[in-house]
Regions:
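Conserved anion-binding
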Residues: 76, 88-165
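Structural preference for beta-strand elements that scaffold enzyme active sites
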Residues: 13-15, 36-37, 65-67, 87-90, ...
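N-terminal amphipathic alpha-helix/helix-capping segment at the start of soluble metabolic enzymes
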Residues: 1-17, 129-141, 197-205
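Alpha-helix-loop-beta-strand connector modules within alpha/beta enzyme cores
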Residues: 49-83, 105-113, 137-140, 188-211, ...
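Conserved N-terminal beta1-alpha1 strand-loop-helix module at the mouth
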Residues: 1-66, 70-73, 105, 145, ...
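Glycine-rich tight-turn/loop motif centered on a GG-T
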Residues: 86-88, 109-119, 180-193, 232-234
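Catalytic cores of alpha/beta
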Residues: 28, 68, 73-87, 91, ...
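C-terminal helical cap(s) of enzyme catalytic domains, especially alpha/beta-barrels
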Residues: 55, 97-113, 234-252
Length: 252
């Protein structure tokens, strides 16, 4: 069952963000652990498309989803990431319905969007030409489109963003949201919680998946609302793993 099918049936999906790891084998570790996806960060990470291509091809071959947070809303970023084999796109700082429509425009083929057709690339498992209709339909059905909500303006426009055809998930970026709301880093402030609740309500109203990439305390608050669940990063996992080695050995 694809991630979009899981979300449509009311199931939760689980993943984390990758900012450092470049070995395609990471997809095996994530799949073995029961995760549904990994999301590679091109907004704050240093990935290039050549590296991402190799990771995505591996994931696709084993039936594991690889998503990308692109650096910005643009045809170049979205279309190239998808042609490299990404099965989901997240655009940071999505603030308006107009921006949401532009995301869909570049992420979806006609009749939903205007994504350009690159023949025989990773997204079609390198199958040659003559399969346009099939490839386009498969991609439109599979690719997950995520609008990241990170500002007060985005919260104000959450209803319109959630109503946009082709947007599958609205995912909260709690750190930047707290900065925009004038409470930088105070993620459990009621102002932040209330803002996030408005986004969750908009998702429920329009039948879109609500997502969080946050700590355990915030997940606890919104556990009945969220479907697209993200915790931690590869950096956090490395740091905590090394710390655990030292602490464990000291106690023996």
């Amino acid at each position: 069952m694809s991630i979009k099918e899981k979300l449509a049936s009311g199931q939760n999906v689980y993943g984390t963000m990758i900012r450092l790891q470049r070995n395609p084998a990471i997809s095996f570790f994530a799949q073995n652990a029961g995760l549904d996806f990994l999301l590679y960060d091109c907004e704050h990470g240093s990935y290039n498309f050549e590296t991402l291509h190799d990771i995505f091809v591996t994931g696709n071959a084993m039936g594991f989803d690889s998503f990308v947070r692109v650096a910005e809303l643009s045809k170049d970023w979205i279309s190239r990431a998808l042609d490299c084999g990404a099965t989901g796109i997240m655009v940071p700082m999505t603030e308006t319905a107009e921006q949401a429509k532009e995301i869909v425009k570049w992420a979806k083929f006609t009749p939903v969007g205007d994504r350009g057709y690159g023949s025989g690339l990773a997204h079609s498992n390198y199958k040659g030409g003559g399969k346009h209709v099939d490839v386009m339909a498969t991609q439109n059905n599979r690719v997950v489109v995520i609008a990241q909500i990170e500002t007060g303006l985005a919260v104000e426009n959450a209803d319109a963003i959630a109503a946009t055809e082709g947007i599958d998930v609205l995912l909260i970026g709690p750190n930047d949201l707290s900065i925009s709301l004038g409470i930088p880093g105070d993620l459990m402030n009621q102002i932040e919680i209330d803002a996030i609740a408005k986004v969750a309500a908009a998702c429920k109203k329009h039948g879109k998946a609500f997502g969080l990439h946050a700590g355990a305390k915030m997940h606890e608050i919104f556990k009945d609302d969220e479907q697209f669940r993200m915790l931690s990063t590869d950096l956090d996992l490395l740091a905590s793993g090394f710390k655990n080695i030292k602490e464990t050995l000291e106690q023996i």
